[in-house]
Amino acid sequence: MIKVGVLGANGKMGTQTVATITAAADLELVAALDLGDSIETLKKSGAEVVVDFTHPDSVMANLEYAINNGINVVVGTTGFDSAKLAKVKELLAKNPKVGALIAPNFGLGAVLMMQFAAQAAKHFESVEIIELHHPNKADAPSGTATRTAELITDARKVANRPPMPDATTSALPGARGAKVGDVAIHSVRLRGLVAHQEVILGDQGETLSIRHDSIDRTGFMPVVLLGIRKVESHPGLTFGLENFLDL
């Protein structure tokens, strides 16, 4: 029985995670914390793994507490840049038995979409990303879109692809999206959406679209459970769920 704590327990992802952990026969929910609750409860409750679905502004402090107290972490909060990842590695180096999984997306289809897009990008002249989310999402572009763009940029470098052609002059700032690596990302925020992403690849005479749609947050839960069950056996930092899957 793995003892699990959840941070951001009252949020949309946190609420679903709490319900899923409670229903799992091999997991025990020992702490469900949200804004205003004491993080010390994690240690007092004996949590072995903590799942963080909080906010980019608070996730680093949560990680520091958990890692320094020997608690493995599964993080779905986005907003991790190279500086934050370096800080996490530094914390883990001082606590080498602790595992930390940071995942831009917990949807199996989303992970596969990122991998497929990176493979396809080696063979197409151009690629852009459109990510679509509900208007309460805290960040833009999404962590999934950022990670996808990084994987595509790396894949294109390995394949020695030339720069993407673009002779457009933008009449308004941001009209061509935000660049991550070589890839333009366009962020849409609309009521009624959950989490969606389309990668559009183009070359002479054809285009290829790779799209993933999260219709309901229950779709994330099987891979959240996978992370909880596997993180302890993967000490150090694991960035991206593809490292826990047979891809």
Question: Where are the model-predicted features located?
Answer:
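Hydrophobic beta-strand scaffold residues
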Residues: L29, V73-V74, G99-I102
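Rossmann-fold NAD(P) dinucleotide-binding segment
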Residues: K43, V49, D57-G76, L85, ...
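C-terminal substrate-binding/catalytic lobe of Rossmann-fold NAD(P)-dependent oxidoreductases
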Residues: K3, L7-K44, K122-L247
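Rossmann-fold NAD(P)-binding glycine/threonine-rich loop
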Residues: E64, T77-A100, F116-A118
